[in-house]
């Protein structure tokens, strides 16, 4: 790469559960990859930096590189929590051994990866949900304000609605279904256990029921079908918001996004594009510079 002062590009995709690092040469050839623990900077900037450095060290080992090569690395960080300005600045003030680092959100990295570094839109629907459009140098974000106040169209919200319907079925207000019985069996038919569980349940705890919802929907379980219809409507709401901001096609990503497509209306199905790459690919693009979310 002409006039680029570093020898290696490093892409890091960091979320609440894992941190993945990929080292490439300037031609995009992958030299090493590794995965470590959480790198959500809202859960602790120092913890995130430790996970990142560990992942890069493991990837470097695979690439037969040493710490002496670190100053020749330009690192692109696509991290959960980077949208919070105070957390962004606190993280960027930490010392590091690399030649340069660039920090933006995991959604931004995923969007860059999905569209090969060019303008485009994605809707991530996994445990949570978030839509992002990159257009003419601007970043447009819809949703993504986390569970339970946002994240419509996600596994967590779908799981929350499931639990609510199960409790209504116990009270005889709505019909019970095989899916409702499946959930009750999970809790040993103990309503108090569901209530106690709910006091500390995290988004991923609600999201754990998503596979069962899809499975029972194939058996025409009325509760499962209604939950997927509602989730599909939520996803179409986010897609429409991105379209109004200028998106023409949208990549659906995440565990729910990849499975919900058949439940969308035909006009929205026609808007769906296939991602060209993932968030690590986007982070590699970020490593080349000019992708910081805020100004240092």
Which role does the model predict for each range below?
Residues 1-68, 114-119, 163-296:
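ATP-binding/phosphotransfer module of carbohydrate and carboxylate kinases, centering on a glycine-rich
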Residues 1-4, 99-123, 138:
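Conserved phosphate-binding catalytic cores of ATP/NTP-utilizing and phosphoryl-transfer enzymes
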Residues 40, 56-103, 115, 199:
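Short beta-strand-loop/turn "lid" adjacent to the catalytic site in phosphate-handling enzymes
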Residues 118-169:
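Glycine-rich phosphate-binding loop of actin/hexokinase-like ATP-binding domains
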